[in-house]
Every structure is written in C-alpha cells, then in structure tokens.
C-alpha cells in the first residue's frame, strides 16, 4: 500500500508533458539555469514566440539567493531572478525582444498572477502555454498558472535539479 501511495504521489507531483506549439513559455523564478536553458531550446525550436521569466527573489530571504547552477557561464551581478533568467535566455539565443519582464514576484502564486498582468498589458492572448520549472515544483507551478489563466491549456516541460527525480524524491530530506 505504501508503494502505491508513493507511486501515485510521484505521478501527481512530477507533472510532465511533451512540448507543443504555444503562445508563450513561462519560467517561474529561481537561481537554477536549467529551466531557462530548456526554455531557450524550446524557443529555438519555435514552440513559442515569447518567453516570460518571472521573479524578484524569494519571499523567505528578501534577496536574490544567487546563481545555483552554471556560475561560470552566468556570472553577472543579478539583483533579481528575472535579471538572471533573462541573461540565461539571451546567452542561449533568445533575443531581447522575445523576453517579457516580470520582476516583482516573490513566490509561485505571484509568478503566475503577475505574469498574467504582463501578458494582459501586452495584449497577448494565452490559449496554450509551456511551463519550464523544476521537476518537483511542476504540479504546484501548473496549478497556480492554471488559476491565473483558467482558459489556457498548459504543457509542463520540467528540468531535473538537485538530482531529485520521481524515483528518488523520498530518499532525501530535500526531496
């Protein structure tokens, strides 16, 4: 019974889809480069015309916690998660005019809610979107973005960070 519980919980938390053509790619804020790198790959393959990284910093620290992966390549003096993620996107081939700006969010619901304000102000109607996030953050990100964009369809294209996967998340405190 415990194994079935873990299996079903893992399936729920670690939401993942194959990418499809979309109106935008969302990247909730953090200090990991992988999600923005994945978004840049999807942009290069023409999955969406815009990428919207979102984030000021974590509400729990009150400052940008720094670059957690890719420090050699992304060595700027970043004040916000958005500044960092924009740099990652641009260094991976996404032009500045395809990167939208949301730099006030301090937690996941704000990432989604404030991103909605940005797309509404830009006149971008979101019918389908891709979310590039941490794999163990996938369900939470999906639920918040669905709440902010109730009429949109979402594809979650997560990245593995911290070595945490659906197969091992129960084996560590971090998972």
Regions found by a protein language model. Give the residues of each.
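A structural signal for short, hydrophobic/glycine-enriched beta-strand patches
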Residues: 1-173
């Amino acid at each position: 019974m415990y194994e079935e519980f873990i299996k079903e919980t893992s399936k729920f938390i670690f939401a993942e889809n194959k990418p499809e053509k979309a109106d935008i790619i969302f990247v909730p804020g953090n200090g990991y480069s992988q999600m923005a790198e994945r978004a840049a790959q999807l942009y290069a393959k023409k999955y969406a015309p815009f990428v919207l990284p979102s984030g000021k910093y974590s509400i729990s620290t009150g400052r940008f916690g720094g670059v957690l992966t890719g420090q050699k390549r992304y060595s700027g003096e970043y004040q916000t998660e958005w500044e960092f993620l924009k740099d990652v996107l641009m260094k991976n081939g996404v032009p500045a005019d395809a990167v939208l700006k949301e730099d006030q969010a301090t937690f996941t619901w704000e990432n989604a809610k404030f991103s909605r304000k940005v797309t509404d102000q830009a006149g971008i109607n979101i019918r389908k979107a891709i979310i590039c996030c941490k794999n163990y953050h996938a369900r939470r990100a999906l639920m918040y973005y669905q709440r902010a964009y109730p009429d949109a369809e979402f594809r979650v294209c997560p990245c593995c960070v911290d070595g945490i996967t659906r197969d091992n998340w129960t084996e560590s405190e971090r998972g």
